[in-house]
Every structure is written in structure tokens, then in C-alpha cells.
């Protein structure tokens, strides 16, 4: 009777939810074995019961039985092991069951997820594995988070979404998580490490499944998400133009249809893209993807010479832009025309959209999928900041961008109901991920603003839009803090800084004035762009967090540097390659690894601490000195000067010692004597003492807000030569 009922239940779930099990052979694993699975909805137990054999027992929570008579039936029956979560003795009882060859199903989380993502995992699962030598099966109920009426989060949901169960035997059960000390603090650390150990493996499994079984390209993702939540608003701009999935698909289809006729054949389908952060930008990007074009996103703040160099490098012949935007920024169109680049204006597209096309797309609202597009097809070309020379063209595939989104959102625990405020430009890798990719792939609403430099306007908009996530650079956050009222950031739940070092003064300022914890992340354009981030689950001050699931890191020894090494990373978010031949050959020689060019340390828990760029080291009297370390030491000691302090450390040639350090600042209170005292009291080597302090009204900066060290060094070298 039990087998017949399970068969009937499986059939019903297949009809309603398209339910399938992948990796079902794992359930035949001999005990002792634990199956741990994400807990997304009230129906999770029914899906698992229909899939597993009668030899599996479900660990249930006794207090849940008090909710109703139906809950009591589910908690107390012959297939369950009810436990009291607050009792430490229950782990011993579970260990006894496993020791006898038992097979237990334990949810990775103690409760149903309240945000749709994997929440805090149970440390006791790893304890049971170590105690009983039990095997571990990782389970992922994909799609259960969208079941309307059965979830506990306010995010996207619908009736009868597709649900699948993916099982995988976890082979990586090693790890020294026992603390040698028996004090309370070390016990808490061990418990935390056990919980993080399980969460890492669960998230890595989720990533593998989503990349293999989910939509493979961004047009496929848009089509899938439109079917799931077509009325959900995913973009809003400063003109309060709102874009839902349905409007996105309609707009992309109509614009794409006209652009297909206007755009000429080009190298690998590349076409220039020059638009600010407005609602039309992501719609135009999807329009280009839907007709098989590769947007080459140009940095309009880089200067016309650099833009011309980028167009030559990418071999583009046309640039999609807006006439009003070109006029607003006084862009030199003639310079591009002289090298054979034509401007295609969106204002000329709308009149060419026929009534028939509008009616057709209203009836058949589906995102077009171009022929031949795959996960490995190039999705966008971005250009590096050029902080160390000529910008390099970076090819990012659909798989790269989707993977980085699927890594970042669950790792940082960003819920569907959150609202992102993004003022970073789309030509910036972080701005593209936050402002375009995450809203498309995850349906998380984003307010996009065209400039991060409007320090007086941005704080008020964050308050007005009730945004919960903001990502920026240290420089921009300091600018906002100068004009913001204490209530402006009251709705912020997650504030992330990347692109440059997060300063202690910024952390203190936001904690004291806005009661907001600013967390530091790390990324590079070549990694789509995010590599690691600190989170509320996993935080270490001074570090840039731990690498995302699916990423590998290694340190390569650098002659002369004893603390740390050159950071190399590998993962599904690492780029396809460079457009620059020399740089691309060097990348391909590393067999999938990417050399970040940063010197870093990685501790036993995996936290990465960036010590500085390889090129940000000076060789003084034969010793390698980190300019970043000296700069950070000075900024930390001068925290009382406030967030308006601009300070950088660079090096110039020196006949006596090879190189000498120079401090450049905008504050007259930073004197030679004060700097020498700080270095002496900090315990740094005497070789770290700067030769002199140079005053400058404003330090040169890149479009991303980072200090332009290359230009700064040229200024210092010119000044040194004159002296």
C-alpha cells in the first residue's frame, strides 16, 4: 500500500510540477548515510517522501507538531525521527541511529527559508559525519522556492512551478574543524566552521545544478523568468520609468527587430554600446543579445583617445547610443567617424517599429533566441580600467555572467524581495552585474542611476526608493556620507564596497552615523567581476571575504615578498579571454587560471586579504616594500582627519636606494614629521618611511572613483625631474 501511494504521489507531482529526480541512484547508498537538502517550502517533505525508499527516516522538529493536527501527523509517524532542537542530547540519539547503519534525511537549515536562499546551516550535520563516519548526500530541491502558498518569503512565486530534485554524493568529507582548546570561544568557532563547511558544499552543489540544468544564455534566462514572474518590476530609473519582465521582452523584441536591419555584419557580431544607467540600457542590451550581437560596452568617461583605441581593438564599426546622451556629455562623434565608426541612435529606432510588429509581440510575448548561441558564446566585451596602461578588452560569456550571479546572490543571501540601488556605470563590471545581470537572472528589483558622482542626490534617492542593497567604492561612499542625513540609509541591509581598499574611517563613519555595516568585497573585470565578499554569515575585518563556491584560489611565490603571494583564481566566472593578443596568450598559458596581479594572503578559513598590486611594490635598498601597506597604515592613523582626506603613496626613482616613497595628499595637516612619527610608531621597517609629503588639491582618479596611480606616478616623476 505504501509503495502504491508513493507511486501515485510521484505521478501527481509529475503532472503538477513536472517533478523529476536526478542522481536517484545516490539514495541506494548503504548506511550510515545522511541526506541533507535545502528547506524552501512546506511541500519539501512531500517531494522527498515520494522520491526516497522506505528505509529512509526524516528528522523532524517536535515543536512544529503544535501548529496544527496536520503538522502533528507529518511530525509523528513511522517514517520520522522527531527531535527537540534545543536539546543537545538529540544529536546523541541521531548518532546512535546512524551507528546502526541508519539513513537519515536532515534539512540543511533549521527552518524554512524566509528569503528563498540557503540560510544558516546546521553545524550538527558535520558533527554526526565525524562521529559516525557517515556518508553525506547533498540534495537540492530546485524550483521549490517559487511554489506559491507554500513558501515563507515575500519574493517571486507562482502556482505550480517546475520542481526537480538533484542528488550528489559529497566526496569531500575531510577538514580539521576540531579546535584544540576547550574554552567557550573556541567551541563557538568550531560550531561556526562546521556550519560554514556544510553551507559551502551546499552552495557549490546548487551552483553546479543551476549551471547544468538552468537556462544557458541571457535570452533564455529572460524568457524563463518572464514565464515565472512577468508582472514583476525589475528596473526603475531616476525618471521613475518602470520595466517589468513583460515590458523587457516586448521592448527587446521590438528594438531588436529594427536593429537587426540597421546593424551591419561585423567581427564576431560585435557592436559598440554607449548608454548611461537608465531603463533603456538593459532593454537595449537584451535586444542586442536576442539578435546574436555582442555588445562592446565603451567607457564614456575614459576620454575620446581611449575610446578610439578600444573601438580599433574590438574592430567595431557601429555604436548603439542615444542622441540626447551624446549631446549631454558633449561626446566627440567626429573623432569616431574619422576612424570609420558609425553612430546608431535609439531615437531613430522607434519610428521604424511597425504597428504589425507591436501587435505580433503583444500576442506572442517571447524573447527571441538567436541561432547558434550557447553558454560559451561571448555575451559582452568590457574594458579594464587602464590603471596600469592601455585598457584590455575582456570577453565574458553568457556562462561567466550567469555563473557569477548564481554565485554572488546566494552567497551574500540577497533575497528576491530586496531592492538594489546601483549608481555604478554599466561599463564597470560591478555596475553591469548589479544593474543588469542580477535583475534579469534573479528578478531582484534595481533602481539604476546614471552617475555615482552626484553626492548630494544619491543619499536622498536611496531613502526615497527604500533600497536595501547598495554597492559602491570607498571614494563614492565617503562622498555620500558627506551630504547624507542619518535616516537616508535606514533601509540598507547590505552595503558592499569594491574596486579599492575599504578604509577604517569609512566603516566607522557609516556605523556611527547610519548604523550600517559596510562590508568589503573583491573582484576584477576578468572574473565577471566578483570573486569574494564578506557577509553577515562569514565576516573577517580587514579581509575581502572568502571566495565564492565553485572558485579555486592559489598563491604563487613572488621573489622578495615573504608574506603572501601572487593570487591566482579559477572558476566558471573566469573570462573567455582578452582581445589583446599578448595578454590573451599569457592567460591561455595558465590553463584556466587567471593571474589577478594582486599580492594576497589566504588564512586557514579561506579569507583573502589583499596586500596590494604586484606593481604597487617598490624595491628600496633591495627590499620589496608594499605601497598599499604604507598607505593603509597612514590612513588608519589619520582617521581623525575625516572622510575628506585624500592620501596616496607612490614611488619615484632614487639614486641612493633605487626607489623612494612619496606621500601625496590634499590635507596640509599631513606633514613630513607626522608621517615619519606614524611609520616609526606603527612598527613598520624604516625603509617604509616616505622621503617627503606633496600637497595636491585633488588626486587624479579613474571613472570608477579609484585613484589613478599611473597618472599620479607620471606627475611625481615629472616633478622629480624638474627638481
Regions found by a protein language model. Give the residues of each.
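AMP-binding/adenylate-forming catalytic core of the ANL superfamily
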Residues: 319, 565, 571, 576-577, ...
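Conserved AMP-binding/adenylate-forming
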Residues: 258-302, 423-425, 624
Amino acid at each position: 500500500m505504501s509503495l502504491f501511494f508513493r507511486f501515485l504521489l510521484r505521478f501527481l507531482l509529475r503532472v503538477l510540477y513536472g517533478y523529476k529526480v536526478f542522481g536517484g541512484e545516490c539514495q541506494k547508498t548503504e548506511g550510515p548515510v545522511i541526506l541533507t537538502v535545502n528547506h524552501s517550502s512546506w511541500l519539501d517533505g512531500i517531494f522527498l517522501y515520494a522520491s526516497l525508499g522506505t528505509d529512509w527516516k526524516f528528522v523532524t522538529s517536535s515543536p512544529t507538531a503544535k501548529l496544527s493536527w496536520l503538522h502533528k501527523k507529518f511530525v509523528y509517524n513511522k517514517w520520522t525521527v522527531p527531535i527537540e532542537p534545543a536539546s543537545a542530547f538529540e544529536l546523541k540519539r541521531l548518532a546512535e541511529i546512524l551507528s546502526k547503519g541508519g539513513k537519515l534525511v536532515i534539512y540543511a537549515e533549521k527552518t524554512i527559508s524566509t528569503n528563498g536562499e540557503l540560510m544558516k546551516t546546521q553545524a550538527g550535520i558535520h558533527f554526526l559525519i565525524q562521529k559516525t563516519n557517515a556518508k553525506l548526500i547533498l540534495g537540492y530541491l530546485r524550483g521549490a522556492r517559487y511554489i506559491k502558498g507554500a513558501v515563507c518569503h515575500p519574493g517571486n512565486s507562482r502556482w505550480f512551478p517546475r520542481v526537480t530534485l538533484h542528488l550528489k554524493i559529497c566526496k569531500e568529507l575531510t577538514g580539521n574543524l576540531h579546535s584544540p582548546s576547550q574554552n567557550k570561544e573556541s567551541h563557538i568557532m568550531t560550531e561556526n566552521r562546521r556550519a560554514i563547511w556544510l553551507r559551502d558544499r551546499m552552495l557549490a552543489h546548487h551552483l553546479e545544478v543551476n549551471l547544468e540544468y538552468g537556462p544557458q544564455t541571457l535570452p533564455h534566462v529572460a524568457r524563463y523568468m518572464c514565464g515565472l514572474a512577468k508582472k514583476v518590476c525589475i528596473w526603475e530609473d531616476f525618471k521613475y520609468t518602470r520595466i517589468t519582465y513583460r515590458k523587457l521582452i516586448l521592448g527587446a523584441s521590438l528594438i531588436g527587430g529594427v536593429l537587426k536591419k540597421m546593424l551591419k555584419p561585423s567581427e564576431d557580431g560585435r557592436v559598440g554600446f554607449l548608454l548611461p544607467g537608465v531603463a533603456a540600457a538593459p532593454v537595449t542590451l537584451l535586444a542586442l543579445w536576442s539578435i546574436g550581437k555582442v555588445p562592446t560596452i565603451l567607457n564614456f568617461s575614459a576620454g575620446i583617445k581611449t575610446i578610439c583605441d578600444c573601438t580599433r581593438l574590438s574592430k567595431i564599426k557601429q555604436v548603439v547610443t542615444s542622441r540626447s546622451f551624446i549631446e549631454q556629455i558633449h561626446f566627440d562623434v567626429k573623432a569616431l567617424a574619422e576612424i570609420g565608426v558609425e553612430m546608431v541612435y535609439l531615437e531613430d529606432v522607434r519610428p521604424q517599429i511597425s504597428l504589425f510588429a507591436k501587435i505580433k509581440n503583444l500576442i506572442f510575448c517571447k524573447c527571441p533566441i538567436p541561432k547558434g548561441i550557447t553558454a560559451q558564446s561571448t555575451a559582452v566585451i568590457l574594458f579594464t580600467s587602464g590603471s596600469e596602461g592601455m585598457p584590455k578588452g575582456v570577453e565574458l560569456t553568457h556562462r561567466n555572467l550567469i555563473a557569477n550571479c548564481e554565485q554572488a546572490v546566494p552567497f551574500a543571501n540577497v533575497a528576491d524581495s530586496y531592492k538594489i540601488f546601483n549608481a555604478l556605470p554599466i561599463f564597470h563590471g560591478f555596475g553591469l552585474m548589479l544593474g543588469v545581470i542580477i535583475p534579469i537572472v534573479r528578478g531582484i528589483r534595481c533602481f539604476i542611476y546614471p552617475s555615482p558622482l552626484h553626492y548630494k542626490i544619491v543619499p536622498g534617492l536611496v531613502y526615497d526608493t527604500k533600497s536595501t542593497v547598495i554597492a559602491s567604492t570607498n571614494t563614492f561612499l565617503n562622498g555620500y556620507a558627506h551630504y547624507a542625513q542619518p535616516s537616508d540609509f535606514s533601509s540598507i541591509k547590505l552595503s558592499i564596497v569594491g574596486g579599492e581598499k575599504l578604509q577604517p574611517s569609512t566603516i566607522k563613519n557609516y556605523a556611527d552615523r547610519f548604523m550600517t555595516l559596510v562590508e568589503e568585497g573583491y573582484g576584477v573585470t576578468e572574473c565577471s567581476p566578483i570573486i569574494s565578499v564578506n557577509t553577515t554569515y562569514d565576516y573577517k575585518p580587514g579581509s575581502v571575504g572568502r571566495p565564492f563556491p565553485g572558485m579555486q584560489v592559489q598563491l604563487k611565490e613572488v621573489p622578495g615578498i615573504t608574506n603572501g603571494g601572487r593570487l591566482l583564481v579559477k572558476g566558471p566566472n573566469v573570462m573567455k579571454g582578452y582581445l589583446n593578443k599578448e595578454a590573451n596568450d599569457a592567460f591561455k598559458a595558465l590553463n584556466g587560471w587567471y593571474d589577478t596581479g594582486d599580492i594576497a594572503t589566504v588564512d586557514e578559513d579561506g579569507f583573502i586579504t589583499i596586500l596590494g598590486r604586484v606593481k604597487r611594490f617598490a624595491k628600496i635598498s633591495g627590499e620589496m616594500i608594499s605601497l598599499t601597506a604604507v598607505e593603509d597604515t597612514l590612513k588608519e592613523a589619520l582617521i581623525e582627519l575625516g572622510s575628506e582626506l585624500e592620501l596616496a603613496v607612490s614611488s619615484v626613482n632614487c639614486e641612493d636606494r633605487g626607489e623612494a616613497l612619496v606621500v601625496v595628499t590634499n590635507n596640509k595637516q599631513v606633514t613630513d614629521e607626522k608621517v615619519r612619527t606614524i611609520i616609526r610608531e606603527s612598527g613598520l621597517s624604516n625603509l617604509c618611511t616616505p622621503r617627503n609629503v606633496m600637497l595636491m588639491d585633488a588626486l587624479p582618479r579613474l571613472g570608477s572613483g579609484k585613484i589613478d596611480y599611473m597618472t599620479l606616478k607620471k606627475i611625481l616623476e615629472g616633478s622629480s625631474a624638474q627638481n
